[in-house]
Every structure is written in C-alpha cells, then in structure tokens.
Amino acid sequence: MSATQPGVEQRIVESDDVIAAMLESASIPTLMMSIVHLTGRTDILRGAIRPKTPLMGEVQGYLDEKEKAVVRALALEALKAYRDNGCVLPPAPDAATIHEMMNFMVGETVPDDYVPMMMEEMSLVARDSEAGSAVADIPASVRKDFQVLIIGAGMSGLLAAVRLQELGIPYVIIEKSASVGGTWHENRYPGCRVDIASHFYSYSFEPSHEWTQLYAKRDELWAYFKRFAEKHGVLQHIQFNTEVTAATWDEGNATWNVELRGPDGTATSRTANALISAVGQLNRPSTPQIPGQAAFKGEVMHSAEWRSDVSLVGKRVAVIGTGASAFQLVPEVAKEAAQLFVFQRSPVWMLPNP
C-alpha cells in the first residue's frame, strides 16, 4: 500500500493483482478484523471460520489453507471497494463491537476492563483522557514550586518525567548509571532482547515504526529510550552516575531529604516535595553463594553484569537457571562453548520455536 507518515490515513492506489499478492503474507485473523471494520459485517465474528487461541509467535490463527483463501477473497473485495470509493474510512466500531472482536481474536472471553485500554491503544478514544485532571485546580504558580525527585531513568522514570513536564511540575532524575534506559542500558549479555512484542513494549503515546524484529534486541530498545529522552528534553534534568543512598520523610516540612553519592564517592543531599521510586524490580542482580565457589578457578558472572571481555570460545560453560535471560543467553553461548551445561531447579515454561 502507499506509504504515508504514521497516523496519516493511507490511500490505496495499487491494482487488484498487487493487493491480492500482498494479502498472501497478511495475518488472517487481523484481516478478518479489518473486514469487519471496512464492511460492518459483524456476522463474521459469529461465523464458522474462527482463529484458535493464539500462542506466542503464531499469527495465522491455526486456520487451514481453505479457510485462509476464503478470508483473503473477502479481504480483496473489501479493499477494492474501499479503494474504488475514494478510501473513505467508515466510522470506528463501538465499544461493544470492539469487545466482540477482541473475544473473537483471542478465542476466549476478554474481561470488560480491557476494552477501554484497547480502544485507547487504537486511538479510538482520546489518549490519557484523565491526564492532568488531578491537578487541574492547582494554579501553575503553585505547581512550579513543587519539586519532585525521581529515582531511575529507565522506562518508568522517563515516563514520569514527561508527565510531570506536561503538568508544569519541576523534577530531577537521579540515575546510578551513565545513560538512560535502565535494564536496556545495563543488560548486555549475548542474545538479550525483549520477550514481549516490540510494539507493546513502548509508550502508547510514542509508538515506534522502526522496529526491525517482533521481539526487539537490546540495542534497539536502548536506542528507543534514548531517542525518547532526547525528544522530550528529559536529559537536562538527569543527574547521571549518582546513587540514592537514603531518603527520609520530614513530617514538619512535608518534604523528603534524599542522600546521594556521586561518581567520585562524594556525599550530597537534595530536598523534594515528592519522591518517585522508578528503580525497577530486577535492577540489582542476586548471585547465590554456592559451597566450594571460592575454589573455582574459572570466570563467574551474572547475566545482568555480563563481561564482554571474557571469551567463551572453546570453554566448558555452566549456566544456572532457565528463566527468560537463559532462554536468550544459552543458544548464543552454545555457538562458542566447547561444552555447555544448564542447571535448572524447575522445568522451563517456554515452548520450542524451531
């Protein structure tokens, strides 16, 4: 289809044959939702062709080739009519229809609570419709004197910063590392990537149209958060290479007294009216103490503190744990190691993806 800027309505000018060829690689369940929108045919949601409950990475709904052909034919007719009638989009489906479409897509009943979120994600309603309502009656002159300190410049800390900027509330971010991005700055082990679809692992108001993979790798994610911080002018509010060592609430002054340690070890302090902890849940690696470990002569490292200066080529390597990091790390290490041993406490929960 003809490319335009994100968020701008796209017009179809391609021939029937080109459209048909494009449909061969499209997700069939997604096509069915597009047909419902373009034609208003909600009977499709109650028809015989239905996707099965999806698993990670499966985008065709486990439909057979005959069913796929039927849907592609319907989609071709819908797109031809849309093109020939001037590419005028019909009204967006209402909340009840969206809910029915959601149930259809996932093969089970989706709780009502998810509908408003999904409609916002698809820009069918105003984004963040309640943003700012909590401080709407507070004069700007009062807001500008309310100081907020955010601990951490990962994805949560950056989001908090942007929201505070929008509300006219001053802030500072204290970040222990040398860059933004949190876990995507610190984690550098081989194969490091997100295990959630990339377009979900981004801010709803700041989608990226540059993801090169469904499950983006670490460098791409880090670049996304760096661009976000630069675009929104957050960097100038960040104190890098500084760690929060203590925070004490002063009831009399209604302020937080925050103790800091700089890159050279110098201790300083700051005062804030509000304190936001955005340190994340896994920002400090937990390394088990194993009996006899002191006698081990080889290299020992945690995946969260990967040492790129250590070569694993031709080595006998042991990996302890089979969590998400191991899923990504082990296949990469196996390419270099002479022998690889994996020790697990519990069976893995991921399905093979040949």
Give the ranges of each region predicted by the language model.
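Conserved beta-strand scaffold positions in the cores of enzyme catalytic domains, especially
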Residues: 200, 238-239, 298-301
